[in-house]
Amino acid sequence: ARKIIEVGVGRSPYTLLQLRFLLPNAEIIATDIDPEAVRELSEIGVKSLVDDIFEPNERVYEGADLIYSIRPPSEIIPRLAELGSRIGADILIIPLSEDAYFSNLSGWERIVENGLIVYLLRKSRR
């Protein structure tokens, strides 16, 4: 992946930092609606931007291969899917412990790896 974006990073950049280590040539970006969280991440060298997934600045996401979110509120998942569809990016969700809200959403692939459950919406499946 050339460009990866975490939506709703908050104050937990651990996955993003690990990705940056594992994929040093990829552009890794964090977004959040909280300007204070974004400022704190910027101070530790994380490329981060204030953005609201309900009114996304699509220029931020252009060219992204993957957009992911860890334990997002269920109401933003359809917004992530819509954004991914518009810009041509895969969407990866690591859900809260309860993942029942995916039962009403179509096209998502459920993946279980070492006990971790993730949902993937591939751009090729839309």
Residue ranges with predicted function:
Residues 11-24:
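Conserved SAM-binding loop of SAM-dependent methyltransferases across substrates and taxa
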Residues 27-32:
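Conserved SAM-binding motif I beta-strand of class I
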Residues 41:
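Conserved SAM-binding loop
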Residues 58-66:
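A short acidic, Gly/Pro-enriched loop at the edge of an enzyme's catalytic core
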Residues 44-56:
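Conserved SAM-binding strand-loop segment of SAM-dependent methyltransferases
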Residues 75-126:
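C-terminal substrate-binding/active-site "lid" region of AdoMet-derived donor-dependent transferases
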Residues 34-36:
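Conserved SAM/SAH-binding beta-strand->alpha-helix loop
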Residues 2-12:
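Conserved class I S-adenosyl-L-methionine
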